[in-house]
Amino acid sequence: MITKLVAVLTCAVWFPLSALAADAPDFTVKKIGEGVYAAISPDSSKAGSNAGFIVGSTGVLVVDTFVDVAPAKELLAEIRKTTDLPIRFVVNTHYHLDHTGGNAVFAEAGATILAHRNVRYWLRSENMKFFPDAKAEQQARVASLVLPDVAYTDAVDIYLGSRLLQVRYMPGHTGGDSVVIVPDANVVFGGDLIWQKHFPNLIDANTADWIKTLEKLQADHSSATFVSGHGDLATPEDVRNFHDYLVTLRDGVARAQAQGKSDQELSASVSALIKEKYTDWGFQQFIPRNIQQTAAELRGEKKVPVAPTPVTGR
C-alpha cells in the first residue's frame, strides 16, 4: 500500500522518494556525539529522509519518523539496541509526510510528539492535498496520521535528566520548521532546512526566510555538526554552500525577471547557471521546479499553507 502512496506522492509533490530500491538499506545509524545518533538514508531508501535520536539520563528524544511505519519500526529497533530507556519525545521538524509518516510507531511506544503549532494544523490537511487522485484507502492513511500532542510557537526547552535539548522555530522550507539543538554535543538537527549537496523541495518554501534562517544557523553554530534532512551529515561549510545555492537561485531568477525574459528563457538561463555551479548535487530533477517556484515567489504568486489564527486565552 505504501508503495502506491509513495508513487502518488512522488508524482504530485516530487518529494525525494523516487528510485526506491527494495534491496537498499533504509538508513545507516551514525554516532555523532555522546548519546547523539543520526539515521542517514540513501536517496534510494524506503525511509524517504533522515532522522535521528538523542539519549539522556531519563529517556530518548527522536527527531522525525520517516515516511512510513516500516522504517520507523526499524529506527525503534535501532534505538533499542542502544538503550532501554523510554522514548519520551518525538520532534517533527515539519509536516511533510517523509518526516512524519512513522509517528504512530513512537506514539504507541509512549512518546509525546511535539512540533511547531503550524505542523499540528497542517499535518493531515496539507499532506492530503498531495493526493487528489488517490484511492480512499490511501487518503485514509494520510487522514489518520498521528498529530503532535504538544504544539509550540517560538521555542521550547526539553530536559532528558540534566541534558538540555533546544527546539527552535526557524522557518524557510515550510512555515512550520523546527531545529533541534544539542548544546553539549554541538549538534544541530536541521530537518529539511538543510539539504546536503542535494537540490531541495521548494513547494512550501519562502526562500527569503530560508536564507535568513541559514545565516542565523551559521552565526550561532559555526563549529557544529549538522544533521540534514536529505543527504549526508553537513559541516558549517556545507550549510554555507546550501545557503549560497538559494542566494544564487533567487538572484538568477530576479535578474532574468528584471530583464523581461519569458518563462522559457528564464528557466533556460537560470538552469544553465545552476547546473554549471552544482554539477555533483543530487536530485537534479528538482532544478526546473526550483526555478518555477522561486519565480512564482518573487512575483508574489506562490501559494503556501496559511498559518492558523492564534488562539488567545483570557
List each language-model region with its residue ranges:
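Divalent metal-coordination and catalytic microenvironments
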Residues: 35, 54, 64, 79, ...
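Active-site HxH/HxHxD metal-binding segment of metal-dependent hydrolases
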Residues: 77-157
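Conserved beta-strand hairpin/beta-sheet module of binuclear metal-dependent hydrolase folds
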Residues: 30-78, 179-191
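Bacterial N-terminal signal peptides
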Residues: 4-18
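Cleaved targeting-peptide boundary
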Residues: 21-28
